[in-house]
Amino acid sequence: MSSAASFRTEKDLLGVLEVPAQAYYGIQTLRAINNFRLSGVPISHYPKLVVGLAMVKQAAADANRELGQLSEAKHAAISEACARLIRGDFHEEFVVDMIQGGAGTSTNMNANEVIANIALEAMGHQKGEYQYLHPNNDVNMAQSTNDAYPTAIRLGLLLGHDALLASLDSLIQAFAAKGEEFSHVLKMGRTQLQDAVPMTLGQEFRAFATTLSEDLARLKTLAPELLTEVNLGGTAIGTGINADPRYQALAVQRLATISGQPLVPAADLIEATSDMGAFVLFSGMLKRTAVKLSKICNDLRLLSSGPRTGINEINLPARQPGSSIMPGKVNPVIPEAVNQVAFQIIGNDLALTMAAEGGQLQLNVMEPLIAFKIFDSIRLLQRAMDMLREHCIVGITANEARCRELVEHSIGLVTALNPYIGYENATRIARVALESGRGVLELVREEGLLDDAMLDDILRPENMIAPRLVPLKA
């Protein structure tokens, strides 16, 4: 192919540019590529967003066809293009950086141009022959970036929501399974990193499952509550300028059918076009889950510390050598990675919050950053949960003897004995144990405060880890 044949000429209100001949995007996308070399993350990095854009364009085309605004031939060609995008074709043509000025116009035009050029080829024309089917006049008919783009973001989040929930649920089940496996392993609970009272390792892991189950329940209800109201049909600022009065209801109805999502028109299109509150709340829920995961990973790192000089109550699966200078060292790399993912999600939430606050009057032009951060948080969170489950949780084993040893040598054990030997004896035993380094049980036996049968009964896991009626003394 000659140099001249490697490009096609396109023009817009700013002039003429040479667009790569093989590209399905057009001149406005090319300008955005040249303008926004920022994150290095293109729209195609988030396939559900691309699919959401294609579904919005399909719904708009269907509504415009039904209203007689779009010819049958153009509708058929646009429909073919959108179907291919929904199947996963041509995603590499979505090349605009996720961070961009213009309130998402570059993303919207990237979609309009790609769909137009796929449609043109389906009609037997060449890319760029927009006199036959135009990115703005036909693909973007009755739309503005300000309603098509936020609708696509919401839809993309909904389309990916089930996968996020599935990953979270699988992680919960993994923790619950370990809770059952370790239900007989007695260990010391700790508060403020100090010995507290006995519990089982199973209780500890079941608590991990329970706290994440709370978030699973909230996420299941939050997304449908927050993301199903769309402003499609509001066009530029929510007034619906340049759209048929019947268009909004038709377009949203078609989008709900195409996507399988229970989408409804926003009650107030002006408000829905300018307010980003739904994204703030949803991102906050992702942050909450990330915070919980990070805390759990802190616990896993502490409980596995050592192996000779730490707590060493559990063993994490060895994933890779841990040091270039210390032979034999193995680090808790999976929990450490999850910690870092959590920090990133927390940072994403703050950036998103600032972007939501940065809106002015009838539009929030910072929506590209909002989209970037929320899709990034979902991807990171889902991958982190899968990694944690597959490469860490399912392979955790308990050091039962170590757990028992720490219980028997812990000063905290005296709390369980207090109802039987009395507060003064318990206080004295604790002091002597601390001063001498001897174990609580050893001292109790030495002083004859309780016999072995009574101690064995008190120290049974089922008697140590739950409320128990203590016989009253005469």
From Swiss-Prot:
Lyase involved in the degradation of canavanine, the delta-oxa-analog of arginine, allowing growth on canavanine as sole nitrogen and carbon source. Probably catalyzes the conversion of L-aspartate to fumarate and ammonia. One of its GO terms (cellular component) is cytosol. The active site is at S323. Induction: Up-regulated upon growth on canavanine. This is Aspartate ammonia-lyase. One of its GO terms (biological process) is aspartate metabolic process. It catalyses: L-aspartate = fumarate + NH4(+). One of its GO terms (molecular function) is aspartate ammonia-lyase activity. The lineage of its organism: Bacteria, Pseudomonadati, Pseudomonadota, Gammaproteobacteria, Pseudomonadales. Homotetramer. Gene3D superfamilies: Fumarase/aspartase (C-terminal domain), Fumarase/aspartase (Central domain), Fumarase/aspartase (N-terminal domain). Keywords: Lyase.
